[in-house]
Amino acid sequence: MITTVIEKIFGTKSERDLKKLKPIIEKINSLESEILKLSDEELKQKTFYFKEQLAQGKTLDDILPESFAVVREAARRVIGLRHYDVQLLGGMVLHQGKIAEMRTGEGKTLVATLPSYLNALTGKGVHVVTVNDYLAKRDRNWMGPIHEFLGLSVGYINREMDNEGRQEMYKKDITYVTNNELGFDYLRDNMVVRKEDRVLKKLNYCIVDEVDSILIDEARTPLIISGPAEQSTDKYEVVNRIIPSLKIRKITEDDEIKAKYSGENLSAGYDAVIDEKNHNATLTEDGIAKAEKFLGVANLYNDVESEWVHHINQALRAHHLYEKDVDYVVKDGEVIIVDEFTGRLMPGRRWSDGLHQAVEAKERIKIKEENQTLATITFQNFFKLYSKLSGMTGTAMTEAGEFWQIYKLDVVEVPPNRPSKRVDGADLVYRTEREKYNAIVADIETLWKKGAPVLVGTRSIEKSEKVSAMLRSKGIPHKVLNAKYHEMEAQIISQAGAKGSVTIATNMAGRGTDIVLGGNPATPQQQAEVVELGGLHILGTERHESRRIDNQLRGRAARQGDPGSSRFYISLDDELMRLFANTSRISGILERMGMTEGQVIESRLMSRQIEGAQRMVEGHNFDIRKHLLDYDKVMNQQRTAIYHLRNKILDGESVSEQVMQMIEEVIHETFDKYYNVKHPQSTDFNTLNIFLQRAFTIDANFSGESIKGKSKEQIDGETFEAVKKAFEERSKYFNEQGVNFNEVERMLLLQIIDQAWKQHLYELDQMQKSVSLRGYAQKDPLIEYQKESYNLYQNMLNKVRDVMVEYIFRLQLPPKRRVSPIGTPSSEGGGETSGADTYSNKKIGRNDPCPCGSGKKYKKCCGADL
């Protein structure tokens, strides 16, 4: 209330922020006549002029007005588009490291050329992040010529590109790339064993297109690079056979409310309870007994190693919470996840913790082995690595609080170039889903007969195909855009504004592509006809959990001052209403009002119920993202330290010094463990000598006689000098044999760190699952996680040190083998052999023979602790 009064008097925060930028707009416009007179060559020379200005001490803000004027003119000459004043405002907001909220059709792609050019002048690189490969390529090919005209290099990344191609593209001044490719490239860069294999430069400045989709919607799923775990997949098939025999109860918001007052036990008489709202599945006492009998296990919870309870819970979720053609599709014998916010397929992404395998078992397709995490990071922590971060979207104000709290990003609402003419109709509410879909199809038919273009938004593939089937039965021609037909996404959505077209699209499929009235390209006559019919009509088949996603769907209509309309259709059977609204109360009210079959209702009560349910879900989803971030913050500090250590090793810092420090620490700890300070003569010298000989290959002959008159520190120091000498002799020997010992140390240390980090991630993952139970003991799980993860991290570092010291002294050169150069006959072919002696630097596998020469497998010998 107070905020509203202040805004009426002083204007909104966005209005106040933009008011400060108006003088700069005037300055840019005043330069336009001067810039217009420049020849193409003179305009290109401005880039060199700006770089000289920066070299002489000017700041980016100092050259902003003229640089924006230059980009505006270059865009006009190269692609025939001139930036509006509001687009200049958007460009300045992005340059300030903020989020610009600009409505659909306001030209956000063109806006990004302004700050990307300005910030690329520093030579440190700019990344423009999009949601898919198509948009990255399209935007590079569309906007890239503007930058290239001005002398900057532009590239883009796609998922098929190899390492060399990526390196080349990231060297460009401006690179268009998807959020997933960028994040995975960062993780892969921190797994390489040669610095030449890294692809990214320092993360300087980033512009995130559709910033709400990337930093909010996708933030619930961390990026994970994984490798196969040494576990069998048999249990998934066994457990999958149990599920059909279990009696299931699904509980809703209504059930919980009733049980709260009646004291009813919701699980009584059932084997498992499915909580759709919180996406959980739990076995009851009856279910546990039934599962134990089926598996032949005395106690499910005592058999911790086999994780039967975990497997059963994941199978329950797979069968009752994850729906085919809603949450995933089965394509070419694979389960492919469907992005719940965009409706797009996500090939290559897999649910973790055995859930993906449980879904594969449910669909009776080949179960792929469970993966173990090798590297992981959340989008929250990844994008915070940039020196400056900005973003743009059509819908950000509803999440402004989260953007500030998580990313410290301010949101500024940029006004449209022309006032919106969109008419947003009130929600139409029906009692049942059947009545709702009949009404939707009837309205589509009415609009289609008039020739008005219609875009129907659905939440899932299943619902889009249901509407499609109903339209086919009516003989209404239409196009379907969902994850099954995503290849034609941009083409289908761009024609959604054509006269008489009916397009069905899941969620925000086609986002980033303009819908031009009359079709694309449209003739003036076609455009005028569609304008006369009221423009594009948006019909939403149900409300999304987030108001922001609903606003995105509405925003597809009425771009750049065009006419258009939007309306949502709701039933009490909709997922949002069923799970989060008190539908029994609403249903009772509707019955008392005497609602008949097919009758529609519009009321403030319904609107309040819907908005209340959406706010509840938004709060719930924010808590999930915050929970993920709280735990990842702990890991992030450790990840940063490990990656920093790896980069120091890769970048050529002396590994020998680090190894000598490790050796010294191990020697100190050895004497602390074995040497009896109070009674030196009582020291177990035999054990001490054996350990020193085994660990450091030195002949230690300590005895009560040899240590007389010496302090522990003296003996410690003498031992270190002897070990140091042995180490230097090993180094000399390797080098004499033509093997760079420094490189051996580097490769070895990297492999040990990587193995230890992989194991550490696994232990953190297991520990995070277990600490949640400590809440029952009145302990904060997050604090417990922080304490234990610190201890695990210290143990990991000690393990790296101990294994490195032991390994470096046991490492032996393999027998030399002659290698024939390419093109020369081998000795087996009767010809002479020629070539240099070579040694394999291949990464050691867990099942490979241990290089120390023991004859054992690596995992049973030097790699046993990793």
UniProtKB/Swiss-Prot annotation:
Ligand binding (Zn(2+)): 850, 852, 861-862
GO CC terms: cell envelope Sec protein transport complex; cytosol; plasma membrane
Write the Enzyme Commission number(s) for this entry.
7.4.2.8
Provide the coiled-coil residue spans.
none
Q: Which UniProt keywords apply?
A: ATP-binding, Cell inner membrane, Cell membrane, Cytoplasm, Membrane, Metal-binding, Nucleotide-binding, Protein transport, Translocase, Translocation, Transport, Zinc
Compartment(s) where it occurs, according to its Swiss-Prot or TrEMBL record: Cell inner membrane; Cytoplasm
According to its UniProt record, this protein's enzyme class is translocase
Spell out the reaction equation it catalyses: ATP + H2O + cellular proteinSide 1 = ADP + phosphate + cellular proteinSide 2
* InterPro entries reported in the protein's UniProt record: Helicase_ATP-bd (IPR014001), Helicase_C-like (IPR001650), P-loop_NTPase (IPR027417), SEC_C_motif (IPR004027), SecA (IPR000185), SecA_CS (IPR020937), SecA_DEAD (IPR011115), SecA_motor_DEAD (IPR014018)
What Gene3D superfamilies does the entry give? Helical scaffold and wing domains of SecA, P-loop containing nucleotide triphosphate hydrolases, SecA, preprotein cross-linking domain
Q: From the UniProt entry, list the residue stretches annotated as the region Disordered.
A: 819-858
Quaternary assembly: Monomer and homodimer. Part of the essential Sec protein translocation apparatus which comprises SecA, SecYEG and auxiliary proteins SecDF. Other proteins may also be involved.
- Family, as annotated: Belongs to the SecA family.
Q: What is the name attached to this protein's record?
A: Protein translocase subunit SecA
Q: Which organism is it from?
A: Elusimicrobium minutum (strain Pei191)
